[in-house]
Amino acid sequence: MIKPGIILGNIICLSGGFFLALNEKLSKIFFLKTVFGLILIISSSCILNNIIDRDIDKKMNRTKNRFLCINTNVFLLKILFFFSIILLILGLLVFYIYINFLCTIISFFGFFFYVYLYSYLFKRKTYFSTFVGSVSGSLPPIIGYVAVNNCLNRCCTILFFMFSFWQIAHSYSIIIYRYSDYKLLNLPVFPILYGKLKTIIFISICILNLFFFNFLLYFFGYVKFFYFLYTSFFIFLWFIFSFLSNSRYFTIKIWSRIMFFFSIFIIFMISFLMSLNNF
């Protein structure tokens, strides 16, 4: 229901932004409160996403055994809905009371984009849903950064574009790997509407943009050279591999699965090296 993998990934991204901004000592409790607030809001988002997507999930091999696909009791849905609202309110209160008002606004903004705009409004209607979803996916490192600095600046803008482009490339890799499921549901996603080849080209463009905005972090002095060197190397490898979908060594299904895991590795390394930047 609460998708532990998504929560863990977002905690890692938040940590990257948090420690990137950290120039002086803050208590460990402050960091844990920031993480706790994020966990509450993402848990709420995941529950509501499962409620909204339960009819789609029933038809997909990857998701057909999820809790709400098996248990369709209306009373249960109401309980889960109210529980998710409680989690949202608690998360916002944690940010408002213990962190700052700006984090509260940004986290609610992410919730709104993911639950209402992406899951409810756009996912079944337009391929732009992926871009809308990437907005919410880009916010955890910004929340971490703002928790420390209590301001939005140029670094936040760079982080926004970095993580948005990563999110799109990551999502399209999943869709290509699960292509038959999305084709069966006839969801209006880019790979179904425009084909795998154009999607692969678009993935490469997104990775190139990630490389560019990652460079801007170094260019404007937000990160040290060691961060730029190592992250550039890993992003470059990901970029090169994005051109190997039609090679004799991989089927496109195997390629897309490797791209998916590669993307997870990339975002982990970016966030991890950000966390080390000021140490």
Swiss-Prot record:
Pfam family, one: UbiA
Keywords carried by this UniProt record: Cell membrane, Heme biosynthesis, Membrane, Transferase, Transmembrane, Transmembrane helix
Chief site of localization: membrane
UniProt record, GO biological process: heme O biosynthetic process
Chain segments annotated as transmembrane: 1-21, 29-49, 79-99, 101-121, 128-148, 156-176, 200-220, 225-245, 254-274
Annotated compartments: Cell membrane
Any GO MF annotation of the entry: protoheme IX farnesyltransferase activity
Record's bilayer topology term: Multi-pass membrane protein
EC numbers, comma separated: 2.5.1.141
InterPro entries: Protohaem_IX_farnesylTrfase (IPR006369), UbiA_prenyltransferase (IPR000537), UbiA_sf (IPR044878)
Catalytic activity line of the entry: heme b + (2E,6E)-farnesyl diphosphate + H2O = Fe(II)-heme o + diphosphate
Annotated metabolic or biological route of this protein: Porphyrin-containing compound metabolism; heme O biosynthesis; heme O from protoheme: step 1/1
Misc remark: Carbon 2 of the heme B porphyrin ring is defined according to the Fischer nomenclature.
Membership in a protein family: Belongs to the UbiA prenyltransferase family. Protoheme IX farnesyltransferase subfamily.
Function recorded in the entry: Converts heme B (protoheme IX) to heme O by substitution of the vinyl group on carbon 2 of heme B porphyrin ring with a hydroxyethyl farnesyl side group.
Listed PANTHER family: PROTOHEME IX FARNESYLTRANSFERASE, MITOCHONDRIAL (PTHR43448:SF2)
Cited HAMAP family: CyoE_CtaB
Protein name: Protoheme IX farnesyltransferase
